[in-house]
Amino acid sequence: MLLLHEIHTVAGRREDEFEAAFRDGWMATLAKDDDARLLYFLRLAHGTGRAYHLVTITALRDGNAYERLATRVQRGDLRSWAADVDKLRHEVAGKILLPVEWSPMHDIDLATVPTDGRTHEPVLYMEDSAWPHEAMLDQYLEKARTHYAPSLEQQTERSLLTLLGVFQAALGAARRREVVLWQRVDFPERLPALFTRELPAHVKGPGTWMHDALEVRDDWQSRLLRSASWSPLG
């Protein structure tokens, strides 16, 4: 399975049209065969970063499915759709992600992904993009497997997230050493404490992820992303 991760800088006045294009066009068209499915349609929460940044994540069965989809956008039935969508956004930045071997989200049965636009309560996600130190990609991934992932399974008064997926940039990406941690925010009411108070010493001292991970990375970015009510996987 491959993931097509795209960040769209949308024209503010055309935001609703852009959303409709993905719901009624992209999602519905991909549902006609077994190559790909839209998994998520998300907004960067206002007040946490650039305005009108929307994120879409599309799953592709394999490399052949990616080639077929790319060809459809380049010169096939999705060419006119892509041209219309370009009128609704200023820019789009995309990358292909691969799940790491131990990622909870690894192989998705695309046939089970909803494509009918059924609605649900919006879900909040935290997407952490980390860039390990030079030549330390494998060491970062191993430390994330043995340290970070188990730490999220420990339920405490500070628990916030559930780890849903761990992905790395595919060959040819602009930044090879990139890892994406895809997490659901289970306790949104605990976010203010994260923003308004310094982390206590006991969660950033030796033996903690915040401390020990500095051996392999000190550069990462977090995004708070809210799903649309019709986003297929919530």
Where in the sequence are the language-model features?
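Acidic/histidine-rich, surface-exposed loop or edge segments in extracytoplasmic proteins
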Residues: L2
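Surface-exposed interaction/gating patches
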Residues: H5-R14, E101-D186, S229-G234
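An amphipathic, aromatic/His-enriched active-site/gating alpha helix that lines ligand/cofactor pockets
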Residues: D16-F41, H46-A51, A59-V100, T146-T162, ...
